[in-house]
């Protein structure tokens, strides 16, 4: 999405006062934490961390959240819960409608228990098994240090006897002989879990945490053990004990106030859970028959089917489809929902996610067939969707209910956000038919290959393979590029089509002139464009409106009619925005990413390769263009932050995700050199084509191709 173009790039080419590109790079040492996604989480963090500022102890959570997500959990009101990850743990809100003043409104997950057992809790009575975490529980060097997985051994996980008053024993075998440096007595036997407390940890629990110890730590799930590890570059003996929610360490070499510390459980858990998304390949296929009513309302009726295979590994009783048009009152009306021949129970989760539940669970490996009938009353055009009555253009972006991904044992869905893009989906196959309810001849452009059209021009058919969603623009006034070759371009095997009003014909031809060379350059430098066609279309929006922006979709790019009056003078943002949108066909359309939690992976990359296109092909325009693209860069959040990470507004979001993200990529390229950098991009594109990448996916490929140490750059912009 090119919201940054409207908000950031329309400013002067000079950096903002006091915020030049050079000063940012020189003064920023480490990326700041993410913002707080809920005031109650912030209040809990502030309360718990008061002792840090006074020097009484070290962090209980960490300097701030580093990741925000909505994770699936059966039985909750919305079907999932808001979580924020910190270095030392995770805070979560299970019932946003509950008593925010309750000490249990914000809770801490049983992260250690899950890492030891290898089972992610995705419901009160349901877990998803991904295998115990083979991550060292403490220290900077994993050699000789037990992992969470090793605590699953029967000799460690089984209940022990009451050893109060005894010397600490270790249950890992000879290589973990208890060192005298951390030899402390056992002072309490926990009847609930069947394990003994080491003296330093019980004193910390009752003296520092007081009546909060159970809420923060949980019960001990293993006996305390002494290990030798590397901390701060030095070999040290520390005492370690695992609890349901936390890991505690005791280091006698530290000052007394910091001898007992929390382990980095939040980081360990996040890396374990999200190292592999465990996304089920559902082989989803969509079919939609869309009937467009007459002007001036353009009421639209849709019959849609969704078919997929239950590859989740267990019986499936529900499905969740993100339904963006439900966001606006009176726009989306569901008439019927059938699952495998049975009328489904419906529920709206976070307002826009349609949950369909059946009384007959679908066995693993079986087919699921969903049939929907719904009506749309298009709103006045705004942003990426709606009806422009003055130009008679109907924008149908994000209009089909779309199956959300199944990841880590549950459906992955989120609330609506005004920031960024509206959802993320697995690559699927679509067959879409669009027609008028009468005999009106429509012209339709959008996602899919080159459309087929009935002789009378009233019915358009699109087939799209391996796309993440679909979008269309409809008008009886469009020039039909299938009948007017001047509204097409050929780039290798790719046919480019332009859908514009007659009075904007030259603008449509200019858009093709701008985008065709970019299509060729990206194909050569990054990897081949994988589809047979690409569509550029105007999507209405009266000329006096300013709350609009260009929008990418698979195999398509829509530009507001209101932008056309601005021209496309070389070097201006209206000149390179079309290139930015073409770049999204590589980053978003082909290589997918969660645009709600990892938006920089498509927006920063699209911004940066656009700049690289200008640098390579228009070197005289590059300095001013690059300055304009990055002049809003800010360090208020990490580049890898998501839309729920506490951004104050769209300006701040764009300045971080687009501008700072592009700056980081530029520093990485300079450190690696052009040859290695582009080899990494080609590797990334080839590896994740048709799949979904993560921040760690891209960073791992950069590290693999780089001879230079990239860590200082990444720490500065991302934080790790």
Could you say what each language-model-derived stretch is?
Residues 373-478:
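Extended, low-hydrophobicity, Ser/Thr/Pro/Gly-biased non-transmembrane segments
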Residues 299-326:
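Ligand-binding face of N-terminal immunoglobulin V-set domains in extracellular IgSF glycoproteins
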Residues 327-392:
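A surface-exposed beta-strand-loop module
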Residues 599, 603-672, 688, 705, ...:
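Acidic/His/Gly-enriched intrinsically disordered linker/tail segments
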Residues 304-311, 361, 421, 428-444, ...:
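Zn2+-dependent metallopeptidase catalytic core
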